[in-house]
Amino acid sequence: MGMVKRFDVYMCENHAKIRPCVVLSPDEMNEVLPYVLVAPITANERPFPTRVGIRIKGKQGQIALDLMRPAAQVLLKEKIGTIPNATCLEISDILKRLFAI
């Protein structure tokens, strides 16, 4: 697998299932650590302030920033896309508020 980049979308092994997720950790960390920070993309839409709407591979879903977690890079399988710039800014804004930074 090539370099894992922030805001790329991968299919990721998760408890015997493979689900889409967004990489949130910075590229500098992704280069040297064996794991990345990811947020799952879920089809179950909820009106939470930590959720961001996304359309990926023709399907509507939400990036669940409230469910972010570390994942070993070896669990990342197929890269299926990259998040659009406007959505990246929205994610960054929510993370700043979430962590009060």
For each of these PLM feature ranges, what is it?
Residues 1-101:
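Conserved functional hotspots at enzyme active or ligand-binding sites that engage polyanionic ligands
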